[in-house]
Amino acid sequence: MAWLQLRINTSSEYAESVGDMLSANGSQAVTYVDAKDTPMYEPKPGEIMLWPDTQVVGLFEADADMKSILQRLGKAKVLGPDFKYKLEPLEDKDWEREWMDNFHPMQFGERLWICPSWRDVPDPDAVNVMLDPGLAFGTGTHPTTALCLRWLDGIDMAGKTVVDFGCGSGILALAALKLGAERVVGVDIDPQALQATKENARRNGVEDRLDVYLPQDQPELEADVVMANILSGPLLELQSVITNYCKSKGLLVLSGILAEQVSKIEDAYSQDIVLEPSAIDGEWARVSGSKR
């Protein structure tokens, strides 16, 4: 089935209203896209974050009466009769197959590979984590995840106890287990993330060495390795919580940090952590070290 895609640029103040109008006029799906490639930071619980310049995208059936729809949209105060838009056809494709074709096994460091389940692993003797894009949040494609995975690949994980703070999809937890960790505890504020982590662990055959908890439910422990790939705001707010998970001489790795935020993170953690030189990938950074 062919589709028409309508793109409208607006501000964050009006983006949801524009999206509601598209839905009311027959859009089968509405998405919000950053119009100017602006970094987005961690929202507060219950808060919906939109970019200052937001592009609202509506998907319409090919036979939709777009002339009438555009006329109705132009009567809305938040748009006005001279609003700017882009209307373009989307050719009929096997979108699922095209989506799958875009993902390939990725290598991090010397040993570690992240592989979609529908692909053959390039090296059966390597450390292979099977993880499908779309099941949850991190799949190795974002620089913050890649920075942590490359760090993990260089660590002797044999017999280690690990905390993955803000585990998301569980990609870092799974990598640690596949690299030889004895036990990993995943912590996240989102129950869906915990469910995704458990499911991904089951798919990789390591569920018996993984426990997951909401922050308020996690038992006290001191781990050999603590990983926190979240964002700088929570890293600063939760500095004492994160460092307390780490035993003396244990290892800590932090990411989700913009390069310009490194000094602030290092200042917050330097009292408790002997810091290594930070690593940079594009606009993102990794901070790591060992507990005093």
UniProtKB/Swiss-Prot annotation:
An annotated GO BP: methylation
Segment forming the signal sequence: none
Pfam families hit by this protein: PrmA
Principal location class: cytoplasm
Highest taxon, organism lineage: Bacteria
GO CC annotations on file: cytosol
Keywords: Cytoplasm, Methyltransferase, S-adenosyl-L-methionine, Transferase
Annotated binding of S-adenosyl-L-methionine, by residue: 145, 166, 188, 229
Enzyme Commission number(s): 2.1.1.-
Cited SUPFAM superfamilies: S-adenosyl-L-methionine-dependent methyltransferases (SSF53335)
Enzyme class (EC, first level): transferase
Intracellular or extracellular location(s): Cytoplasm
Catalyzed reaction equations: L-lysyl-[protein] + 3 S-adenosyl-L-methionine = N(6),N(6),N(6)-trimethyl-L-lysyl-[protein] + 3 S-adenosyl-L-homocysteine + 3 H(+)
Entry keyword annotation includes S-adenosyl-L-methionine: yes
InterPro entries: Ribosomal_L11_MeTrfase_PrmA (IPR050078), Ribosomal_PrmA_MeTrfase (IPR004498), SAM-dependent_MTases_sf (IPR029063)
GO molecular function, one term: protein-lysine N-methyltransferase activity
Keyword Ribonucleoprotein attached: no
Annotated function: Methylates ribosomal protein L11.
Family of the protein in this entry: Belongs to the methyltransferase superfamily. PrmA family.
Name of the molecule in the record: Ribosomal protein L11 methyltransferase
Organism annotation: Alteromonas mediterranea (strain DSM 17117 / CIP 110805 / LMG 28347 / Deep ecotype)
Name of the gene: prmA
